[in-house]
Every structure is written in structure tokens, then in C-alpha cells.
């Protein structure tokens, strides 16, 4: 059984990690241990590079806390131009897989508040009245009318980031 350290305690992210690992390695093939670690970037990262750095930092910090694990996984959400997206970073001590998620264009009313210094999650919670929406369906669920959720979009990115770990051509 793979010991997977999730560099987040966010249920939407943990669900995506668990589903993706079970899709690739089989049901019941892993145990997820969530840990809260620092990203080393602002609460609301801007741009692809800052967001990617946050995910990489979380993986490195989780690895320092739990060096005995088989995998360390981080999902860092950010804002790039007028959209939200995330970077997924997965490390197994030998190699690293990274993938960027799909992007969701955000309406100006939301972006204006984010550019004023507020994180997307609290802005969306205030907009929708849903407490801690970032730990649930997120802006993705709201603006796709539930057709996608934060977790479903992250799931795809985790699957992509896992590609180097089950395809020999990457080694």
C-alpha cells in the first residue's frame, strides 16, 4: 500500500488525490495522510510561476515532515490573468510529476475583490453565502452550475501529474 502525504488538509483536494491514485494504482492501493504545511507564497498566489512555486514548496515541506512516505502531493490554486487554476506537484523521492489544471475564467466582480488583496475562497464564500466554499465545490462548482467541481478539476490534474510514475518512458 502506498503511503501518500497530502500537503493539504482541504477535503476537495484530498478527494481528488485519493480518486486519482486509486484510478492509477487500484482501489485501496494507498493511504492518504493530510498535513498542513506552508507554501512559502502569499495566501492568494498570482501567476503560474508563483503558484507552481507554492505547490513545490508544499511538497518539499511535507517531505521533510514525513520522509518515510512513498509519495508527497501538493495542489496549489492561483490566479493567472482573469482566471483561476492550480498546479499539482507529485514527488516520490526519485522523480517528480507536475501538471497544471484547467482554468476557469472569473467574472470581473470577483476578480476586482481578489485584486484588492482578498483570497478567492473568502470572496466566493461572501458572494455565494456558502461557508468555506474553497473546501467544497469552489468557484468551479458555482460558475459551471455544478457540472464540474474543484475536486473534479483537480482530479484530472493529479492524473496528469501521476503519468511519470506509471509509464516507463518517463524513466
Curated annotation (Swiss-Prot):
Reactions mediated catalytically: XTP + H2O = XDP + phosphate + H(+); ITP + H2O = IDP + phosphate + H(+)
Gene Ontology BP term (one): nucleotide metabolic process
Highest taxon, organism lineage: Bacteria
InterPro entries named in the record: ITPase-like_fam, Non_canon_purine_NTPase, NTPase/PRRC1, YjjX_NTPase
SUPFAM superfamilies tied to this protein: ITPase-like (SSF52972)
Family: Belongs to the YjjX NTPase family.
Subunit: Homodimer.
Listed cofactors: Mg(2+); Mn(2+)
Keyword set includes Nuclease: no
Residues the record lists as binding substrate: 8-13
Enzyme Commission no: 3.6.1.73
Native species: Salmonella schwarzengrund (strain CVM19633)
Biological role: Phosphatase that hydrolyzes non-canonical purine nucleotides such as XTP and ITP to their respective diphosphate derivatives. Probably excludes non-canonical purines from DNA/RNA precursor pool, thus preventing their incorporation into DNA/RNA and avoiding chromosomal lesions.
Keywords per UniProt: Hydrolase, Magnesium, Manganese, Metal-binding, Nucleotide metabolism, Nucleotide-binding
Cofactor comment text: Binds 1 divalent metal cation per subunit; can use either Mg(2+) or Mn(2+).
GO molecular function: ITPase activity; metal ion binding; nucleotide binding; ribonucleoside triphosphate phosphatase activity
Protein name (database record): Inosine/xanthosine triphosphatase
Gene this chain is encoded by: yjjX
Phylogenetic placement of the source organism: Bacteria, Pseudomonadati, Pseudomonadota, Gammaproteobacteria, Enterobacterales
Statement: the UniProt record of this protein carries the keyword Nucleotide-binding: yes
UniProt-annotated binding residues for Mg(2+): 38, 68
Amino acid at each position: 500500500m502506498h503511503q501518500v502525504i497530502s500537503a493539504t488538509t482541504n477535503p476537495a483536494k484530498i478527494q481528488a488525490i485519493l480518486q486519482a491514485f486509486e484510478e492509477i494504482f487500484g482501489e485501496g492501493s494507498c493511504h492518504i495522510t493530510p498535513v498542513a504545511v506552508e507554501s512559502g507564497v502569499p495566501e492568494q498566489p498570482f501567476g503560474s510561476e508563483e503558484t507552481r512555486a507554492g505547490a513545490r514548496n508544499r511538497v518539499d515541506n511535507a517531505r521533510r515532515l514525513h520522509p518515510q512516505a512513498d509519495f508527497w502531493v501538493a495542489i496549489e490554486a492561483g490566479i493567472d490573468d482573469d482566471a483561476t487554476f492550480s498546479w499539482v506537484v507529485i514527488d516520490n523521492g526519485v522523480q517528480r510529476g507536475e501538471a497544471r489544471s484547467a482554468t476557469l475564467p472569473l467574472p470581473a466582480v470577483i476578480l476586482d475583490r481578489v485584486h484588492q488583496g482578498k483570497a478567492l475562497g473568502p470572496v466566493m464564500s461572501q458572494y455565494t453565502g456558502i461557508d468555506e466554499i474553497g473546501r467544497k465545490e469552489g468557484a468551479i462548482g458555482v460558475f459551471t452550475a455544478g457540472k464540474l467541481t474543484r475536486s473534479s478539476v483537480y482530479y484530472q490534474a493529479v492524473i496528469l501529474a501521476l503519468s511519470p510514475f506509471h509509464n516507463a518512458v518517463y524513466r
